Amino acid sequence: MSEEQLRRQLYDSFANRAHVYRLLFEELRAELGEAKAAGLMGRAIYRRGAQQAARYAPFAPADLGALKEAFVGGLPDGGALFAPEVVRCDAGGLEVKFHRCPLKQAWLDVGLPEAEVAALCRVAAEVDRGLFEAAGFRFHADTYRPGSEGCCFLHVRPGPAAG
């Protein structure tokens, strides 16, 4: 199998994940309402992120340089899938702006309204919150807003044990 075929499969797998999220969200929203659907999915996605946190825990609570190398350096397709820009990396914080997101793109490609894409992005970003918080860092993300460029802007801060 060629590198291009593998790359296409990688991108297709992210699009598939996006569509599973979307369909699940639509079903839950129809049964429970948007707030409960988002909360339920967000908690499950957070837990999945937390399950993957061990690879970043050695850098907690405050080795943000090593965290940057491990996280950004480990992004799929050499980072091309998300087009990360490290905006800040110092003792006070790590900030990474994603200029692309395969989930967001998949939702836009099927014609979802931007407001719905933004809601799904907020839910999907819980994976990163789970990942970084369970690893021992403080974290928040600015997620996609209709009309804005790119997607998530991740803000990682030293964890509680760092003082």
Predicted regions and their residues:
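N-terminal accessory segment detector
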Residues: 1-122, 130, 138-152, 157-163
